[in-house]
Amino acid sequence: MKLKRAYSPGEVLNMKIPRYEFTGDWQASIGNPAKSGVWIIWGASGNGKSSFVMQLAKYLCGFGRVIYDSLEESTGLSFQMSLKRHKMDEVRKRLVILDRESMDQLEERLQRRGSPGIVIIDSFQYSGLNYKTYKEFKERHPKKLFIFISHAEGSHPAGRSARKVEYDADVKIMVSCFNAWCKSRFMEKPGEPYVIWEEGAAKTLKDDNMEDYLNGMGE
């Protein structure tokens, strides 16, 4: 078996690794992330997860074309209302919405020349992936950024496979109390909470265990 090339520290430091230059609240929460890899976002119902994902998708459209594969919610009324509430028509030229497109169909789409570089998959549980097929999928597309939305079980993604993805992901984001709590490999410490909805966040008591949770998030 042919071995892969080995590198010196200097060679790695001199590599030009593409990254996004985030600003403002997004940079404070996530840093300046690589343009490829995996993120995972999870949270209990009613805490602002859907709104956060829409806000994130809209922000990422400022950097390039984004696929949103709505596996769980489809393109029904609630999804339509969310698009309207966040004025997603403003990024209509860069946001590609897929109505429950299977992972096989999505894979075929991603193999096309010029396919979008950012892919939001909502949700991991509806994708049908397990940890093995997830790893194979992401390794076939090393230049893409995949953002998986997940159900929550306690303070972690729901299910064994999603929990493993939490540990594998470059950016892990838990949505709670209308805040997005981020832990990113592109920052030396957990980022500042991203406030999804100020009024809702102000009315919700702060979780006293949040600091302990952040310390226990997947590395």
Each PLM stretch: what is its role?
Residues 17-33:
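Pre-Walker A adenine-sensing motif
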Residues 139-219:
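Phosphate-binding/switch region of NTP-binding enzymes
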Residues 97-149:
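Phosphate-binding/switch loop-helix module in NTP-utilizing enzymes
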Residues 47, 74-75, 103-104, 124-129, ...:
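Short acidic, S/G/P-rich loop/turn micro-motifs used as interaction or catalytic elements
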